[in-house]
């Protein structure tokens, strides 16, 4: 079971390291956790920071297309890379990465196909 955590970003070079650091590297029931950053036309070093952090996948949009577009690109890309489960989190460190195992638990237990939280 592969989990890809997608992070749509716009000028998040300062907060992205906090977000990536907070994401659990191992989760019970998940064989592989990967991180995907979708850089929505940032004018700062968001993509470079993502690369320095060693995230698994980076998609750079040539200009700001908006959060909804970046989100959809992230979903399509995560599926292309074989994600069984996709979690979206924000690049501004708004959500706690430690909540990801609780978020996906109903999916792993076959109690839900989608979870929003």
Give, region by region, the residue ranges found by the protein language model.
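Structured catalytic core of nucleotide-sugar glycosyltransferases
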Residues: 1-117
């Amino acid at each position: 079971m592969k989990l890809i955590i997608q992070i749509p970003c716009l000028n998040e070079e300062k907060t992205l390291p906090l977000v990536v650091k907070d994401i659990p590297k191992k989760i019970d029931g998940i064989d592989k956790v990967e991180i995907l950053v979708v850089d929505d036309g940032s004018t700062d070093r968001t993509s470079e920071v993502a690369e320095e952090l060693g995230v698994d996948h980076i998609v750079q949009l040539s200009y700001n297309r908006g959060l909804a577009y970046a989100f959809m690109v992230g979903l399509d890309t995560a599926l292309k890379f074989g994600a069984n489960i996709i979690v979206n989190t924000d690049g501004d460190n708004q959500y706690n990465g430690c909540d990801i195992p609780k978020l996906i638990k109903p999916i792993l237990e076959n109690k839900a196909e989608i979870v929003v939280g």
